[in-house]
């Protein structure tokens, strides 16, 4: 019986194969062969997989040629937007990624693929305040999203806001249940807080929360 193809599922499979299942050189060979078979039902996924394989092999221009063709037919596809962001950043043109993503993020600001790619593009473009603002809004809704905290930490570090950087690192450790490491990071943050007494008060309160969490964990 003929079953309609699930495009998103096929793209997800291609992504896993291209990025994780094969070594970089063989991934290129595999997807070049898949594209050459010209099976229409899966050709788009094979092209996408080939683009990702080219990226792993540092053949960025070849990857971009394919992704330009794919995204022209499906501009809102999250798989394609994610890949194009990586390509623009690899080419040293993160602002092109920012502009590409902007209307999609405006329409759907809570989508993690869009928000985190936009934040990454901002950081790559040295627009740290924009990245932090976007990530703060995202974390209001998805406060336990690890990658968002990691990107926040990177933005703070590159903008030399070291107290905030250590606070973001603390949140990452806490998500893993490593509360003692989280407390260490907050103590570093406290030392960088200077004369900001309100900030120090917030840090002390968070230290207490993490120590309480560690005590509860030890009692289990």
Residue ranges, per PLM feature:
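Extracytoplasmic and endomembrane cell-envelope/extracellular-matrix remodeling and assembly machinery
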Residues: 1-102, 178, 194-195, 199, ...
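Structural marker of alpha-solenoid helical repeat scaffolds
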Residues: 73, 107, 141, 158, ...
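Alpha-helical solenoid repeat scaffolds, predominantly canonical TPR units
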Residues: 30, 66, 100, 134, ...
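Alpha-helical adaptor scaffolds
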Residues: 78, 82-159, 163
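Extracytoplasmic/secreted proteins, especially bacterial periplasmic and envelope-associated proteins
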Residues: 62, 96, 130, 181-184, ...
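TPR/TPR-like (Sel1-like) alpha-helical repeat modules
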Residues: 140, 167-195, 208
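Canonical positions in the second alpha-helix
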Residues: 34, 70, 103-104, 137-138, ...
